[in-house]
């Protein structure tokens, strides 16, 4: 019976298994109904000066009877270690558990609602400072695109700065009065005015040359009048023979009158 009592687990509350409430000698000695009546703390490496930064362990030995009986008679005892399941950084309240992110801060049980303290990883901003010479390293495939976009932005900013934001109303009215072409662009009035001035000069030159044309026409008429007598007589013979011969061609009188009026040939009838 004595060995069974020694090997039986300690009767401790179930919420102490999470390690949020540390065990003390007063709490263990106050439970008279339990089979363990004495508690003896064993010094560990943490008490000797070697302290682990992440976890700390404390060993407790439980033996039946008082402390005197345990010292006098060596009896088998059960030793177990209670390791805190939380990280301790020197704060008064325990930190969150790694396995259970949503844990009650005071009772050590998994809460039904999410905790206010987030356990996700913190996004650290990248180092935005450039090198001393101001160079920025980019991907080789994106270099040309970046340069092209920078040039287009610089060009757009330059145009927006040079252009005046307001145009006077008189300039707008003047633009509305200017003649436009089929495409909507303004016509060049200087070339149109030059074309208009060239047309009267051409007409004057043609008028100047009219007397010369008259002299040329008169010389042509003189040349036509100076035909040889033989040609005239031959024509007279041809006309007379064709007009009076019964089988020959008869030339109408109207044609003769028209030919005489034109002056292409002068006939002596």
Swiss-Prot record:
Gene3D superfamilies per UniProt: 6.10.250.2430
Compositionally skewed regions (Polar residues) per UniProt: 198-207, 214-227
Residue ranges that the Swiss-Prot or TrEMBL entry lists as coiled coil: none
Bias (Basic residues): 168-180
Molecular function GO labels: DNA binding; DNA-binding transcription factor activity
UniProt keyword Zinc present: no
Annotated segments matching region Disordered: 168-227
Compartmental location: Nucleus
Keywords, in A-Z order: Activator, DNA-binding, Nucleus, Transcription, Transcription regulation
Cellular component aspect of the GO annotation: CCAAT-binding factor complex
Origin superkingdom: Eukaryota
Motif placement: Subunit association domain (SAD): 137-158
DNA-binding region: 164-189
Subunit structure: Heterotrimeric transcription factor composed of three components, NF-YA, NF-YB and NF-YC. NF-YB and NF-YC must interact and dimerize for NF-YA association and DNA binding.
Family membership noted in the UniProt record: Belongs to the NFYA/HAP2 subunit family.
Xref: PANTHER family: TRANSCRIPTION FACTOR NF-Y ALPHA-RELATED
Protein task: Stimulates the transcription of various genes by recognizing and binding to a CCAAT motif in promoters.
Protein name in UniProt: Nuclear transcription factor Y subunit A-10
């Amino acid at each position: 019976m004595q060995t069974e009592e020694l090997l039986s687990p300690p009767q401790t509350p179930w919420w102490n298994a999470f390690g949020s409430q540390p065990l003390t000698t007063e709490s263990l000695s106050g439970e008279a109904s339990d089979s363990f009546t004495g508690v003896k703390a064993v010094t560990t490496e943490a008490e000797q000066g070697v302290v682990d930064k992440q976890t700390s362990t404390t060993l407790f030995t439980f033996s039946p009877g008082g402390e005197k009986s345990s010292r006098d008679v060596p009896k088998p005892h059960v030793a177990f270690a209670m390791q805190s399941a939380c990280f301790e950084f020197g704060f008064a309240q325990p930190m969150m558990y790694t396995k259970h992110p949503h844990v009650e801060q005071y009772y050590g049980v998994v809460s039904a609602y999410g905790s206010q303290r987030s356990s996700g990883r913190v996004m650290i901003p990248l180092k935005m400072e450039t090198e001393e010479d101001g160079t920025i390293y980019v991907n080789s495939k994106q270099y040309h695109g970046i340069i092209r976009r920078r040039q287009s932005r610089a060009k757009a900013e330059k145009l927006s700065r040079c252009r005046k934001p307001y145009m006077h109303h008189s300039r707008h009215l003047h633009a509305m009065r200017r003649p436009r072409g089929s495409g909507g662009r303004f016509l060049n009035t200087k070339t149109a005015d030059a074309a208009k001035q060239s047309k009267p000069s051409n007409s004057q030159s043609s008028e100047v040359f009219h007397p010369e044309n008259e002299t040329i026409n008169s010389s042509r008429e003189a040349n036509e009048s100076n035909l040889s007598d033989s040609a005239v007589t031959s024509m007279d013979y041809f006309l007379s023979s064709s007009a009076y011969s019964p089988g020959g061609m008869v030339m109408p009188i109207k044609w003769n009158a028209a030919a005489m009026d034109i002056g292409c040939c002068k006939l002596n009838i």
